[in-house]
């Protein structure tokens, strides 16, 4: 319905649709709107018993995708009353439900959404938020530093705790569990939690800084997860962790627990690339960013640009803006098709991890700014002189680059020299620079923005 007048209370969704040969794209868009709201494959007499014109979603615009033959941007508006308040499970059952299996379309991807202000107000938002997290940690004016314990699996509890202690003592703010360490036979969660928190407390006492370790509470049931989170709280942890694969309802449940208990909630995006990486089918990661900010997580892995994982610079900037801005404007090069007022939901901290090292510090600060957690796993634990030396190299590199930036220097072009100068008085940094030099992962991104000169979504 190209004549449909969009309401402020409408939820707007943008789909990238590739219809089957012979299927009209306008008809495909209308079918998507119907199936994701009230319609089925035929006319039913019970339509006469409802306000179908109100509840049926409206496909209001269809545009060809630039440089992509037979692919279309389909804009669909949903009335706010179609969705249960504060329920991500209900929202997603409609928006990414049956329509992704439609035979009439070869491929379908959810690219972006605009959440109405009134609906956003029914979601909790981040349990702690960036501002309060910095106040609790007493750390300002720079990115936070972290590392993932390696190897991910197989360490004993005591050796695991030793890694945590050495990394934090060397200068990191956080250590973390990885996504697939839960409570396996080689190390049950209680053992890991106890030794990890011993390392946290020892390092905090020695350095005088607030330290933390992301204790992964992911489990088979909500009862297991609450039990693990409660144990982490009893041990004095300031932060717990969950994986995206636990599902939207479990994520919201843990976010509410974290708000009640004054805990920071870290989310590892394990599993997202199974549906977010390919350009033609699935959903864009920016939508996951929006949903996770709504659901209430405080941290989410959102890309590094220069690391080993998928990440186009413009797209990642769009992810970071989605997580951090109070109002997001339309920005097509960054893949942001809708303006979004975040209804005062707290900021969610992006996390950069995967194949980064101290020699890239100037690039990381340039691309990602201060409001980020930089996590150097292999870039800490792979240091030839040990874990503590790796942590020290990262901390010295970060502080040298922040000082140079604050002094007004061109830290981007001078970055390598700034690092070399800092390494003159820091042996661990010199060793790291000699080892990793300018290693980076330069591959063509599989998911880049479709730049359109004329904004297609200003409504």
From Swiss-Prot:
Reaction it catalyzes: 2 (2R)-3-phosphoglycerate + 2 H(+) = D-ribulose 1,5-bisphosphate + CO2 + H2O; D-ribulose 1,5-bisphosphate + O2 = 2-phosphoglycolate + (2R)-3-phosphoglycerate + 2 H(+)
Site feature (Transition state stabilizer) residues: 308
Keyword Oxidoreductase in record: yes
Cofactor binding notes: Binds 1 Mg(2+) ion per subunit.
Keywords: Calvin cycle, Carbon dioxide fixation, Chloroplast, Lyase, Magnesium, Metal-binding, Monooxygenase, Oxidoreductase, Photorespiration, Photosynthesis, Plastid
Residues that bind Mg(2+): 176, 178-179
Protein name stated in the entry: Ribulose bisphosphate carboxylase large chain
Organism of provenance: Calyptrosphaera sphaeroidea
Top-level taxonomy: Eukaryota, Haptista, Haptophyta, Prymnesiophyceae, Coccosphaerales
């Amino acid at each position: 319905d190209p004549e449909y007048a969009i309401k402020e209370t409408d939820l707007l969704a943008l789909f990238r649709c590739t219809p089957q040969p012979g299927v009209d794209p306008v008809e495909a868009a209308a079918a998507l709107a119907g199936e994701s709201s009230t319609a089925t494959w035929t006319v039913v007499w019970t339509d006469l018993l409802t306000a179908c014109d109100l509840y049926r979603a409206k496909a209001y615009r269809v545009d060809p995708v630039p440089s992509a033959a037979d692919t279309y941007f389909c804009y669909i508006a949903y009335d706010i009353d179609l969705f249960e308040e504060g329920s991500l499970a209900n929202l997603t059952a409609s928006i990414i439900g049956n329509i992704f299996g439609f035979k009439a379309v070869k491929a379908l991807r959810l690219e972006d959404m605009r959440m109405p202000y009134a609906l956003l107000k029914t979601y909790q938002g981040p349990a702690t938020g960036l501002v309060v997290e910095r106040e609790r940690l007493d750390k300002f004016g720079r990115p936070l530093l972290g590392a993932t314990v390696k190897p991910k699996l197989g360490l004993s509890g005591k050796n695991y705790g030793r890694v945590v202690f050495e990394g934090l003592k060397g200068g990191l703010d956080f250590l973390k569990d990885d996504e697939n360490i839960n409570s396996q036979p080689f190390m049950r969660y209680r053992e890991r939690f106890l030794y990890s928190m011993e390392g946290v407390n020892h390092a905090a006492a020695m350095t005088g800084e607030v330290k933390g370790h992301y204790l992964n509470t992911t489990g088979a049931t909500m009862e297991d997860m609450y039990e693990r989170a409660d144990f982490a709280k009893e041990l004095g942890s300031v932060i717990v962790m969950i994986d995206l694969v636990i599902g939207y309802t479990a994520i919201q449940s843990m976010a509410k627990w974290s708000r009640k208990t004054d805990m920071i909630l870290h989310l590892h995006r394990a599993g997202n690339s199974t549906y977010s990486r390919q350009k033609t089918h699935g959903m864009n990661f920016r939508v996951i960013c929006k949903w996770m900010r709504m659901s209430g997580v405080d941290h989410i892995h959102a890309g590094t640009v220069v690391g080993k994982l998928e990440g186009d610079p413009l797209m990642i900037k769009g992810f970071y803006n989605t997580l951090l801005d109070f109002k997001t404007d339309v920005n097509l090069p960054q893949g942001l098709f809708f303006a979004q007022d975040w209804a005062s939901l707290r900021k969610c901290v992006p996390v950069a991890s995967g194949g980064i090292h101290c020699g890239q510090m100037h690039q990381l600060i340039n691309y990602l700014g201060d409001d980020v957690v930089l996590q150097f796993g292999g870039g800490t634990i792979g240091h030839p002189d040990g874990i503590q030396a790796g942590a020290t190299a990262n901390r010295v590199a970060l502080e040298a680059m922040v000082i140079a930036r604050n002094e007004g220097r061109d830290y981007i072009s001078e970055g390598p020299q700034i690092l070399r100068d800092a390494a003159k008085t820091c042996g661990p940094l010199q060793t790291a620079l000699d080892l990793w030099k300018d290693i980076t992962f330069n591959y063509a991104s599989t998911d880049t923005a479709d730049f359109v000169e004329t904004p297609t979504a200003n409504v």
